[in-house]
Design a protein with these regions (language model features):
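...captures the hydrophobic TM-helix bundle architecture rather than a specific catalytic motif
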Residues: 1-241
Length: 241
């Protein structure tokens, strides 16, 4: 299995859960758990990877005319976060199976959860800045769906709208910062960005680039002073919040 398929697996899992949800609640949980566990087990043999080494970089044609490829990397740091995403995700799958009531749609919950896990996994495995941004925007969308899961509750609808508005606006700032960063470096590949520290810091656009990226990251991760949407997001089901 390549990194491309590893990143794609949770999205396939989201579709699979939706298909088997008609067979019963347990089938949805088993499908979500099996896909998550399979991806986690695939990453397990690389657990010895040092933090300063890159094990694998894979590229697939995406928009070659624009110089953009689907590019994935696996190093010690991305492996750590991928393990956290999948490990905690597996616990959420188990917890939610016994937490949600008979009236709750198990298939919809697990499909949205798999979409969220896939989006986060795509972020930590991305080698391309634009691709990373696409996955990060998918976390905003899937967060909206999860926070508004109990859509009959006003606080859930309000929390979902607030989260989407704040993180969506932050996405525009992040896009601007990434475009400037790509302009400075001449590439959107993270490997090139990491190797161009001196060039970036000495460039006249360094400060606006840094400010835009920080604005995007702070809004999406609910850092002060953009943390106000996070308490409202707790309207999501407890296994998520």
């Amino acid at each position: 299995m390549t990194l491309f398929f590893a990143a794609l697996t949770p999205f396939v899992g989201a579709a699979l859960v939706a298909l088997v949800s008609r067979l019963g609640r347990s089938h949805s949980a088993w499908a979500a758990g099996a896909v998550t566990l399979a991806t986690l087990l695939w990453l397990a043999p690389s657990a010895h990877l040092p933090f300063d080494d890159t094990l694998l970089i894979q590229q697939h044609d995406w928009m070659p005319g624009l110089g953009l490829n689907l590019a994935f990397r696996l190093d010690g740091l991305s492996l750590l976060f991928a393990g956290l995403i999948l490990g905690i995700g597996l616990l959420i799958v188990l917890y939610a199976r016994y937490y949600l009531s008979e009236r709750d749609s198990m298939g919809r919950f697990y499909s949205c959860l798999m979409l969220f896990m896939g989006s986060m996994l795509g972020i930590v495995l991305s080698e391309n800045l634009i691709q990373l941004l696409v996955f990060w925007e998918l976390t905003s969308l899937s967060s909206f769906l999860l926070i508004s899961y109990w859509q009959h509750r006003e606080e859930a609808r309000q929390g979902a709208r607030m989260a989407l508005a704040v993180t969506g606006l932050g996405g525009f700032a992040l896009l601007g910062g990434f475009l400037l960063l790509g302009h400075i470096v001449g590439s959107y590949e993270l490997s090139d960005v990491f190797a161009s520290g001196d060039l970036i810091r000495s460039h006249p656009l360094y400060v606006p680039t840094l400010v835009l990226i920080l604005l995007g990251v702070f809004t999406k991760s609910a850092q002060f002073p953009f943390h106000f949407w996070l308490p409202h997001a707790m309207a999501a089901p407890t296994p998520l919040s």
